[in-house]
Amino acid sequence: VSEEDARQLQRGNYDLTFVIADGLSARAVHAHAVPMLDAVLPRLEGWRIAPIVIACQARVALGDEVGERLGSELVSVLIGERPGLSSPDSLGIYLTWQPRIGRVDSERNCLSNIRSPGGLPYELAADRLVWLMKAARGQKLTGVQLKDTGFLPP
């Protein structure tokens, strides 16, 4: 985060911060970030959500610094995944409890291949993400210690 951008991130008392990052596929973010947010936000009634942060040429770890600066309990990074042979536009979501600089990948949960058609549909991804968010708040952790075994698709 640049010094100028850091000044824009006003600390608050937030349950959740969303960071939208182009990552390795701007196409994925352009196609799927808004429909994904449209699916998940109505499921978060009563949550204190920080202003959405949009980042260019960003990686997942940026969410740690953004979430820490904003004083957020959880950060959810929506990011364009590395294009593959069959899917050049998959969106990934990385969820981190108590974001701060220095978090490692094993401290995050990931949903991947979110796209419609052909991947994890937005509504199902939203159900799974909200389940993970609630479980993270209850157990006060994310990552390899937080298993989504309690999630059953409809």
Region roles according to the model:
Residues 30, 34, 60, 119-127:
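Electropositive phosphate-/nucleotide-binding environments in soluble metabolic enzymes
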Residues 64-92:
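Glycine-rich phosphate-binding loop
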Residues 81-89, 94-154:
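C-terminal functional extensions of proteins
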Residues 34-49, 95-108:
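Gly/Ser/Thr-rich active-site loops/lids in small-molecule metabolic enzymes
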Residues 15-18, 50-53, 73-77, 93, ...:
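Structural motif
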Residues 23-28, 58-59, 81-85:
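Gly/Ser/Thr-rich loops at beta-strand to alpha-helix junctions
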Residues 41-70:
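Active-site rim loops that border cofactor/substrate pockets in soluble metabolic enzymes
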